[in-house]
Swiss-Prot record:
Keywords: Lyase, Pyridoxal phosphate. HAMAP family: D_Ser_dehydrat. PROSITE patterns: DEHYDRATASE_SER_THR. Monomer. This is D-serine dehydratase 1. The keyword Lyase applies. InterPro entries: D_Ser_am_lyase (IPR011780), Ser/Thr_Dehydratase (IPR050147), Ser/Thr_deHydtase_PyrdxlP-BS (IPR000634), TrpB-like_PALP (IPR001926), TrpB-like_PALP_sf (IPR036052). Its cofactor is pyridoxal 5'-phosphate.
Amino acid sequence: MENAKMNSLIAQYPLVKDLVALQETTWFNPGTTSLAEGLPYVGLTEQDVQDAHARLSRFAPYLAKAFPETAATGGIIESELVAIPAMQKRLEKEYHQPIAGQLLLKKDSHLPISGSIKARGGIYEVLAHAEKLALEAGLLTLEDDYSKLLSPEFKQFFSQYSIAVGSTGNLGLSIGIMSARIGFKVTVHMSADARAWKKAKLRSHGVTVVEYEQDYGVAVEEGRKAAQSDPNCFFIDDENSRTLFLGYSVAGQRLKAQFAQQGRIVNADNPLFVYLPCGVGGGPGGVAFGLKLAFGDHVHCFFAEPTHSPCMLLGVHTGLHDQISVQDIGIDNLTAADGLAVGRASGFVGRAMERLLDGFYTLSDQTMYDMLGWLAQEEGIRLEPSALAGMAGPQRVCASVSYQQLHGFSAEQLRNATHLVWATGGGMVPEEEMNQYLAKGR
């Protein structure tokens, strides 16, 4: 972006200056609305989420057999919700900032099959596509026991079709593993940030991995191009997919059920704050949508991004969405948080969700490494760097009097609050890689 254009952008949006300087930045969204007001802009409804829920239930008998690690939950891919009181104390001590309320961790990092939040959306979209093909071919009815999809005739049927996706790692992992298990031919287009072990794991499942020297945007574009030339190839579009988004959104009612089981209350007097790491936006956007449907105006969602990849904060704050990239303002999009190394946000998610998100913030790679180490020490939970992005949220919210006043939170409401950090990945990181991460923390 030329200087004159840049100067006028900064004049209009002074916060951009902090982003360019790679400073850890927090922006509380002045444009949030009620769910009733913001919902029409999403273009999806509660019924769409119910349909996704029903589809995952139809596939549960299949998943329980195809992936024995899901058998205990009857083929439902869901993660644990745990309190992390020792980490809460550590954060308060390190940041000299009390965190009012209780701190919880949602362990999507340890979801079965692919060990990340992408086991929600990625697997769901592959299953939805497989179901559509099988129904259209007359091989399946909605009333069937879907475990019949494991039979050789189905494998044979699906092998005529292929799936392609562009990814920095975790989405490719979930789509690759699931597609290969169903019988699809699958190609994952991996950006330069993708970890070697993720590529190796995909190849071990018979997935074709195409590697790029460039970033996520290029990998997605190339994947899209390659798929266009083959009518039997289905491209999973992380930047625009409503199906992926709905796969993530099912998490809302699942979490509501977990809260009920644990006797946790969410209402006006007991607000819920949720902190979601954000790459291109599909995962956190879908989860936030599901949370809003489940808890209404009593849940407050925040997106967390690396200082080197603040694409969603930049897009929503300036209103330019996918018309601007972090590279346009001189930021390099290079971060240890490989799952969040995205320079241009999803235009669909930004526009759909901008009224339903309370805020956005950035944090440095070093902050993620530090918190990664503290969590391992205090709670014995090991995550990959990007999964710690949400962990910086509670102190930002608790430190901001202006945010609390904007939403009219009393001291008592904050004392009764639940702060939920969404841990997005790390359950399958090889030990030597994890040791390298731990060594970087302070």
